[in-house]
Amino acid sequence: MLYEVQFLSYNQRDQVQGWIYVPAAKPKGIVQLVHGFGEHSRRYLKMIVQYLDADYIVAADDHVGHGKTAIVNNNSWGDWGDKGFHTMMEDEHSLHDLVVEKYPDLPYFLYGHSMGSFIVRDYMSKYGDELAGATICGTTGVWPDLEKGIQILEQDVA
């Protein structure tokens, strides 16, 4: 079963577009997908099907400035509004609350890819006690030449 959901974004400007996918069998838990920059949640349909086949509910939305949320709100791609990154994290929490209202007794997991991994990290620092776990995928690591690049930029700006 598929439910389409909408909710007012934390930015008080946009209607976030989301989906709740429910398996045919009794669900074992919930996985909320948090997509990356320039993506949309339906990019993950193959993964969603795998979770459904494993009897997990999947929740996903398109961030402000992304996918169907940007289209419905007539926004430019990447227009997050004020406090964009924080807005996306709080919007993920709003989706969590919608799902938990329907399915209150299931373990809840977040899966964040790329920029979504940073949103999940921020989420865990504030709401981590609401989660059974999280997967952080495609995140950044140490860049050995980053310090050198910063020094070059500082010299150019000075």
Roles of regions detected by a PLM:
Residues 35-39:
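Active-site glycine-rich loops that stabilize anionic/oxyanionic intermediates
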Residues 14, 22-30, 56:
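Proline/glycine-enriched tight loop/beta-turn segments at coil->beta junctions
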Residues 103-114:
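Alpha/beta-hydrolase fold nucleophile elbow
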